[in-house]
Amino acid sequence: MSRLFLVLDTGAAVLLVALLFVVYRGRQSARGPLPPGPRGWPLVGNVFDMPSTNEWNTYMSWGEKWGDIVSVTLFGQHIVILNSVQHAYDMFEKKSNIYSDRPVITMAGEMVGWDRTLAVLRYGKRFRETRKLFSQLIGTRNHAERFSHHLEHEVHQFLRRVLREPTSLLKEVRKTTGAVILKMAYGYEVQEGDDPLVDLVDRAVEEFSISTRPGAFLVDTLPVLRHVPAWIPGAGWKKKAQVWADDLEMTCNVPYAFTQQQMSAGTAIPSFTSAHLESNPDPEQEILIKNAAASLYSAGADTTVSAVSTFFLAMTCYPEAQRKAQAEIDAVIGNDRLPTLADRDKLPYVTALCWEVLRWQPVVPLGFPHCPVKDDIHAGYLIPKGTLVSPNIWKFLHDPDTYANPFDFEPERFIASPGKTAEKDPRQIVFGFGRRICPGMYLADASLFISCAMSLAVFDISKVVRDGKVIEPVIDYTSGTISHPRPFECSIKPRSANAEVLITAMHETREK
């Protein structure tokens, strides 16, 4: 008899679950259908459909089949991909009161600790206070240009190091970017050769890119897995999370303590951190400043490394664009000095070239997901509360309806001429949308310009010729939140004896 009751109870439970599911789906249908997408499996959803590399290309192909708004589910978690920039504007800007939050990312946020930084921070009071710290110092183009001397000095050093060792280009790009951000954020000047602080923060930023990649860790979809013991086979990701958390903790604390020590000694170089500490903030405000400074590095360093690396790859592959930019620099600046940020408005082609670097290979091909704080009906589709809504930045910037010949590198597209209007400024896309737009966009823009302009002024960048054979670089990029060109070879030589003298004389002048 007990077995009979057990069977009846089990059957009733199954019927109840089925009934609740039907009711839920009915309510969902009454509010509107979910956006279309690939058909998933029971319970696991579309887990077998998700791409492991170059997700943006897969999502773009889904858009061609299902439309500009595509949805999938992973273990019940709704994910929406936007393949139209207009939908991104309509949702993230016009309805920013709904779409300004971030999802809870268990691995990167709760386990590693990146949820203290601006990119991952949930929308609310702390988010607004952190953004205010940025806007006070680098919130406008004029504010960002206050740091022009930092930028120009570090790029000067970059030119000297590349002249001495051109085969170490990508290593020097990373070191220079780290030097710029560390000086601006903390007043820290990097050492010659390998610098332990640059190595530390670079490692942490790389870990950020890996840990925030959608679908990289199952615990993001099934948060209960965070309670699995680290010793269980297959749970090596928990040990990884602890190592990454330690790296992030040091990244936040070590340079911050350096600035405090320098201020106490009266030797601090003006920086983001020192400027905010001068007001003697209370302990809670100090934590906010510390995390904001870490945000400046985590958001600015790796993205700039990617963009400057892409610049050198583009110049290797598109020599005609390089020659046009150099001709403009020669005509406007001459050959007796290097370009500065003050020259930017006089160099429209070089500026357009920098924009094309951002468009051709965007540093963040798949934008960080926004998360609606309540159910929304958009374009006739239901976007449930808590959905991960990701803008496909790659698709936006390679849409043939917006950009002619979108896969070619053509800076001219951004320069109006008789009978031709300029194409859309990619900075309106690559730096994000609405209340989550990058607060360091003016600084990033300035950093890319000065790196490109100074390099073009003194270097010829070309394909490597080995044993009489031209080595064609492969245009291939890594997956992850921040995408980088895979290592490539290029030849870098001084444009002239005068250019070489200009680099070395500049360094000798600074040493006197």
Swiss-Prot record:
Keyword annotations of the record: Heme, Iron, Membrane, Metal-binding, Monooxygenase, Oxidoreductase, Transmembrane, Transmembrane helix
Q: According to the UniProt entry, what is the EC number of this protein?
A: 1.-.-.-
Q: Which residues bind heme?
A: 438
Molecular functions per Gene Ontology: heme binding; iron ion binding; monooxygenase activity; oxidoreductase activity, acting on paired donors, with incorporation or reduction of molecular oxygen
Give the highest taxon in the source lineage.
Eukaryota
The answer, when asked if Heme is one of the entry's keywords, is: yes
Q: State where the protein is found.
A: Membrane
Chief place where the protein resides: membrane
| Cofactor field | heme
| Membrane topology, record value | Single-pass membrane protein
Sorted alphabetically, which InterPro entries does this protein's record hold? Cyt_P450, Cyt_P450_CS, Cyt_P450_E_grp-I, Cyt_P450_sf, Cytochrome_P450_fung
Protein's pathway: Secondary metabolite biosynthesis
The residues that cross the membrane are 4-24
Q: Name one GO cellular component term.
A: membrane
**Family indicated by similarity:** Belongs to the cytochrome P450 family.
Job description of the protein: Cytochrome P450 monooxygenase that is able to use 7-ethoxycoumarin as a substrate for oxidation.
Record-linked PANTHER family: P450, PUTATIVE (EUROFUNG)-RELATED, P450, PUTATIVE (EUROFUNG)-RELATED-RELATED
**The protein's name in its UniProt record:** Cytochrome P450 monooxygenase 208
What gene is it encoded by?
CYP208
